[in-house]
Amino acid sequence: MTTTEIRLDENVQAFVVAATRDAEKAFRVLRETGTVTGNGTINFVERVPGTEIAVALNEPGPWADDRTVVPVVAGFNGDVLSGAGSAGFVTGYAKVFRAHPEITSVVHVHSPWLGGWAQTHRVFPIRYAAVQRLTLSRRIPPHIDRSVGAGDFILDQLTRDPDLIAIFEANGGANVIGRAGLLELAKLVVLLEEGAQYQAIAETLGGSVDFDKSNLAVQWGRTGLADEARRRGLI
């Protein structure tokens, strides 16, 4: 990785300003809703459309005297173009961005209930209606073998599940995938954390139960996914 302070073109600069503003809002909401607590690890990476550049936006954390969000702009090759910090998360997801132009954003997040499920090394079935209606994906897999990078693991899982929305970082948190920008990704994280909590509570009551197909039809019908679900034989 090298650091090369250059003048970014106006479109990239404007994108970085907007992404930083969105990240500030997301960090505030994720804290206020209790989605993250304690150390509050949240690392967004937002690709700059039409380029091989991404913006890394990290929550400063509770110990920071200055809570200002400082973006790091880096190329997929690891060169830092603007800001002080590592391009690690950018390079970690670069293969994913290159192979899947529909993916706009990835966030690495530690939250209590998603983190709890990450401790189990179990595949997490999506059984919360507010999450399921947003995706045709039905599960969140655990990334256990850390000799394989997160980006490579995500790529492999996308070949099995093209609608994948997240993976668990075994014994850590989750990497959540966005296809509609940073704020929509942050909203998904809030819902995933809610669902993880509800399903954990259900574990104490005998376990959560999968959707009836009629319920899946209702949920996907609300978000325009029902026709594709029928084409795939999911309902």
Segments the model singles out, each with a brief description of its role:
Residues 1-235:
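Glycine-rich flexible loops
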